Swiss-Prot record:
Predominant localisation class: nucleus
Gene: Snrnp35
Superkingdom, taxonomy of origin: Eukaryota
CDD domains given in the database record: RRM_snRNP35
Name used for this protein in its record: U11/U12 small nuclear ribonucleoprotein 35 kDa protein
Nucleus is among the record's keywords: yes
Species for this entry: Mus musculus (Mouse)
Cellular component GO terms, alphabetical: nucleolus; nucleus; U12-type spliceosomal complex
Bridged cysteine pairs (disulfide): none
Keywords, comma-separated and alphabetical: Isopeptide bond, mRNA processing, mRNA splicing, Nucleus, RNA-binding, Spliceosome, Ubl conjugation
Record-listed cross-link Glycyl lysine isopeptide (Lys-Gly) (interchain with G-Cter in SUMO2), residues: K172
Residues covered by region (Disordered): 146-244
Lineage: Eukaryota, Metazoa, Chordata, Craniata, Vertebrata
Ranges where the RRM domain occurs: 51-129
Amino acid sequence: MSDWMPIAKEYDPLKAGSIDGTDEDPHDRAVWRAMLARYVPNKGVTGDPLLTLFVARLNLQTKEEKLKEVFSRYGDIRRLRLVRDLVTGFSKGYAFIEYKEERALMKAYRDADGLVIDQHEIFVDYELERTLRGWIPRRLGGGLGGKKESGQLRFGGRDRPFRKPINLPVVKNEPHREGKRERRERSRSRDRHWDPRPRERDHDRGREKHWQERARVWPENDWEREREFREERVKSRDKRDRSK
């Protein structure tokens, strides 16, 4: 388990559908769909993918000027694209920002995630479509992150990193017959403290916050791993360029 990492270095739909990346069978149809999908990144996208950030959860009213004002604090911006609907022209709530220098990219990656812009807490990550090998977008059953309400959570990204697998011995419970008094006492205790939804929500929020914070801090606490990760992405891009 020494080579375990919370962030995926290669996209595997089956692993992405697992909270700790250890599932051996797909748990929903979307994972199956992603496993069978073949995706080719959009060749019309320009710019250096290794200097590009993905910015999501934007207020639909946020304009390009506002994004440029905020993200230029971290360094010189080469290109900024707020993705809009081709028909209506309305914002889709996410953007791509390309910096001129890697130092600016890394600073924005560390510091801009979680910023509040126009009353919305934004999410910042590297661009993955052209840099993460094997990438499958959400519309094909892949992607990373997501909300519980959508029923399509994907792990191994900054938003929802893999949790470290815990190997525990399986203990078989022997049959145990409760007496009437035991059952009655347990029933009374449950009735006195019955409030499942708030407790479950609080517990889930706490766990999600814990793992999100670990993902945010991880690059700062382990710069060597982060450098190796980015160097591998550079090598992968160079090989791809030479093969064209």
